[in-house]
């Protein structure tokens, strides 16, 4: 039976289960691009470091997802920064076989993050802002684990043993833009250009028009 991220007990979806399944995520074009850097990455790693000592389950910030109509990609309405960072972390540590894919609608929607990470490892970094921050995150993780230690092994074992989980909020397609705006009120303010972009993309999706 195929894994269904929306039908898990208590709305809990474990990160290992998510990443080892052939799930395709889509980050809609109306969202801000990936913007985490060294500071945010190190904060997440430090938080994980603390919980690893206790060896208890750790609940990440909730992730809001909108299921496709039929077969298709799952839209990430809120939580893409952390989801992307965890993907890069698991990819770097290579502790599981990652089958999930994340696509970014504002970029080339046929290229997923795994392909971008392969380019980064080969020193082929694109000249767009998102890839700059993907690379910054990769470097921060690389620096964090550069010295082999017992702690690093404990970190890898914890991630592999499926103790990280999300609370999944399911968002109806008709409520997507309202939910996105409400959830981002308390976060980093969008620039005027990003607000205009969000409005235009919302109109495009609602009216099925293509913007030049």
Feature annotation, model-predicted:
Residues 1-212:
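Covalent nucleotidyltransferase
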């Amino acid at each position: 039976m195929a894994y269904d991220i929306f039908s898990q007990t208590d709305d809990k979806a474990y990160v290992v289960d998510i990443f080892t399944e052939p799930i395709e995520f889509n980050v809609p074009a109306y969202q801000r691009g990936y913007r985490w850097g060294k500071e945010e990455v190190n904060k997440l790693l430090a938080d994980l470091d603390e919980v690893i000592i206790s060896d208890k389950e750790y609940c990440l910030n909730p992730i809001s997802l909108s299921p496709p109509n039929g077969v298709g990609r799952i839209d990430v309405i809120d939580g893409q920064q952390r989801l992307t960072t965890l993907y890069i972390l698991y990819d770097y540590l290579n502790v599981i076989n990652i089958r999930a894919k994340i696509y970014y609608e504002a970029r080339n929607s046929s290229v997923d993050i795994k392909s971008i990470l392969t380019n980064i490892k080969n020193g082929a970094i694109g000249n767009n802002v998102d890839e700059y921050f993907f690379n910054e995150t990769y470097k921060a993780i690389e620096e964090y684990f550069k010295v082999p230690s017992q702690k690093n092994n404990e970190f890898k074992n914890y991630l592999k043993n499926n103790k990280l989980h999300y609370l999944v909020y399911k968002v109806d397609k008709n409520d997507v833009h309202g939910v996105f705006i409400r959830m981002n009120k308390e976060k980093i303010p969008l620039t005027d250009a990003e607000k205009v972009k969000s409005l235009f993309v919302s109109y495009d999706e609602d009216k099925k028009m293509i913007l030049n």
